């Protein structure tokens, strides 16, 4: 009996060691998987940053993905022109050339049956003629001040490339893909591997209705990349025209950095759309969002002030923020920043897990 018990103990011990080994292996694999959460209010540029991460790893799009993107390019072009045209009455604008009314009529007919059609030269021609009209260009330039809904910052790029996009064999190039405006609904995940470390990056919807999904799902992330659009200091929310977009972004940042779920989580702040901000600040002061600002109306001083406003929102004086000024559509600049950020996260993660 004693011998039998000894054999059972031996077998049990072997199984225990095997289980311990598997647990340690799984723990090691988990420790070498870095989870990143992209956060920010709607229209801040999160989806573009996620696409840049994909480019960083040279992960190409499938034929099906490119086909879906092409359809979205077509849809965005037509719908966004329609939104601009429909904003004319409230702006008290009229076409100087009566032929543009014909283009609007044809565009309306196309939209009614758009789901059954592919984008073709006739539709592109009507959009192109409308885009050349000075009234349309003025309305586009004033889209934010007039709060014209669903007009992206990169719409002009697609209008200017209509000839290429309208060709029968069109397939989005890397710049089209990067600048394509997509609304994130729910949770989007991208996985890639850098320096033998696996990354799982989550992008969640930025509109208010999407935010309830954030905290309870992502308390174990290694780092948060929070994106705020610098250029939104003189804009209001589409879903609430009484709320300044910059102030809303700061409120969200405050709730995230002071959340008990993210008390020990690294937070990287991307002050995005620096190119648009640099141009806009020449025309309108940031006092639109910050009446207390008394500095000069230049890029350096205003950005420094905004940085301080964000950093002051943290209730934890020991919490370190990594702040970068970004233009998410500038591939070279963002790639360098992302490479630096990812290296920092890898080093921090390995240090915490005792692997470095």
UniProtKB/Swiss-Prot annotation:
Region listing for G5 motif, in residue ranges: 308-313
GO MF term set: G-protein beta/gamma-subunit complex binding; GTP binding; GTPase activity; metal ion binding
An example Gene Ontology biological process: adenylate cyclase-modulating G protein-coupled receptor signaling pathway
SMART domains linked to this entry: G_alpha (SM00275)
Binding site for Mg(2+): 29, 166
Record region (G1 motif): 17-30
Region of interest: G3 motif: 181-190
Cofactor(s) listed in the protein's UniProt record: Mg(2+)
Biased composition (Basic and acidic residues): 7-25
Residue intervals of the G-alpha domain: 14-338
Record-linked PROSITE patterns: G_ALPHA
A Pfam family matched in the record: G-alpha
Region (G4 motif): 250-257
Positions contributing to GTP binding: 25, 27-30, 135, 160, 166, 188, 254-255, 257, 310
Region feature (G2 motif): 158-166
Location of the region described as Disordered in the Swiss-Prot/TrEMBL record: 1-25
Keyword field contains Secreted: no
Keyword field contains Cytoplasm: no
Residues with a covalently attached lipid (S-palmitoyl cysteine): 4
Keywords of the record: GTP-binding, Hydrolase, Lipoprotein, Magnesium, Metal-binding, Myristate, Nucleotide-binding, Palmitate, Transducer
Subunit structure of this chain's protein: G proteins are composed of 3 units; alpha, beta and gamma. The alpha chain contains the guanine nucleotide binding site.
Sequence similarity: Belongs to the G-alpha family. G(q) subfamily.
Its biological purpose: Guanine nucleotide-binding proteins (G proteins) are involved as modulators or transducers in various transmembrane signaling systems. Involved in behavioral responses to P.aeruginosa by controlling the expression of daf-7, a member of the TGF-beta family, in ASJ sensory neurons.
Protein name: Guanine nucleotide-binding protein alpha-2 subunit
UniProt source species: Caenorhabditis briggsae
């Amino acid at each position: 009996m004693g011998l039998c018990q000894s054999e059972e103990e031996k077998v049990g011990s072997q199984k225990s060691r095997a289980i311990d080994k598997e647990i340690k292996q799984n723990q090691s694999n988990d420790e070498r998987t870095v989870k990143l959460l992209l956060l920010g209010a709607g229209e801040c540029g999160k989806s573009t940053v996620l696409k840049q991460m994909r480019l960083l790893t040279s992960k190409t799009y499938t034929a099906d993905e490119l086909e879906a993107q092409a359809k979205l390019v077509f849809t965005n072009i037509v719908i966004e022109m329609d939104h601009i045209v429909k904003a004319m009455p409230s702006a008290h604008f009229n076409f100087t050339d009566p032929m543009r009314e014909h283009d609007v009529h044809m565009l309306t007919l196309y939209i009614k049956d758009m789901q059954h059609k592919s984008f073709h030269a006739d539709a592109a021609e009507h959009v192109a003629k409308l885009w050349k009209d000075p009234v349309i260009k003025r309305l586009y330039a004033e889209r934010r001040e007039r709060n014209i809904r669903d007009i992206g910052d990169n719409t002009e790029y697609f209008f200017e490339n209509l000839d290429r996009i309208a060709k029968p064999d069109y397939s989005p190039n890397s710049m089209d893909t990067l600048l394509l405006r997509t609304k994130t609904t729910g949770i989007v995940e991208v996985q890639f591997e850098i320096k033998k470390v696996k990354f799982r990056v989550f992008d969640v919807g930025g509109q208010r209705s999407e935010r309830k999904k954030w905290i309870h799902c992502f308390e174990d992330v290694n780092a948060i990349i929070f994106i705020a659009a610098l250029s939104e200091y003189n804009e209001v929310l589409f879903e609430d025209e009484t709320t300044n977009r910059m102030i809303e972004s700061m409120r969200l940042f405050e709730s995230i950095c002071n959340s008990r779920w993210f008390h020990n989580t690294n937070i990287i702040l991307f002050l995005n759309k620096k190119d648009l901000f640099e141009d806009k600040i020449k025309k309108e002061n940031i006092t639109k969002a910050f009446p207390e600002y008394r500095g000069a109306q230049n890029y350096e001083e205003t950005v420094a002030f905004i940085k301080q406003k964000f950093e002051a929102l943290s209730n934890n004086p020991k919490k370190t923020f990594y702040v970068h000024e970004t233009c998410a559509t500038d591939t070279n600049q963002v790639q360098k920043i992302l490479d630096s950020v990812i290296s920092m996260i890898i080093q921090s993660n390995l240090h915490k897990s005792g692997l470095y």
